[in-house]
């Protein structure tokens, strides 16, 4: 039988499910929570990332908009979000993408068309971009105006 908080006679008798607690609190305060598997639109992304920093939200939203068959550079994303010198911060943010594969971080490349990071991860991103029809030569995206977003 669940115990009231403050009347715990035996710690083994405590029944407290944090996930239920989380949803109950959200219901009480009227907040809408979006589960990762329900994220499909730009508005869903905004809502899912509501507690993330403004910078992180901007990076993930800019990346979310990159269409299949196109790539964008870390530099261009940094410029798009108004932080032109923050290329490395963009890369670090995308490295921790909480909305993979909804936010297509594999479509973001270095300015020379290369894939940064560890070779195994870079090879996976390279393969993914190539499967979307992007031309790869010598392990890098061939940067052309018709491919850049």
Describe the predicted segments one by one.
Residues 5, 17-18, 48:
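Intrinsically disordered, low-complexity segments
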Residues 24, 28-149:
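Nucleic acid-binding interface residues in structured DNA/RNA-binding domains
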């Amino acid at each position: 039988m669940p115990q009231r908080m403050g009347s715990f006679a035996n710690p083994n008798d405590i029944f407290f499910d944090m996930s239920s607690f989380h949803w109950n609190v959200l219901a009480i305060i009227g907040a809408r929570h979006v589960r990762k598997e329900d994220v499909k639109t730009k508005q869903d992304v905004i809502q899912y990332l509501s507690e993330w920093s403004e910078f992180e939200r901007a990076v993930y939203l800019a990346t979310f908009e990159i269409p299949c068959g196109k790539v964008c550079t870390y530099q261009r994303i940094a410029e798009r979000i108004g932080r032109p010198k923050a290329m490395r911060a963009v890369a670090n943010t995308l490295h921790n993408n909480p909305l993979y594969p909804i936010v297509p971080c594999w479509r973001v490349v270095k300015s020379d068309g290369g894939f940064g990071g560890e070779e195994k991860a870079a090879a996976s991103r390279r393969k993914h971009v190539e499967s979307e029809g992007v031309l790869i030569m010598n392990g890098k995206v061939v940067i052309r105006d018709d491919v850049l977003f």
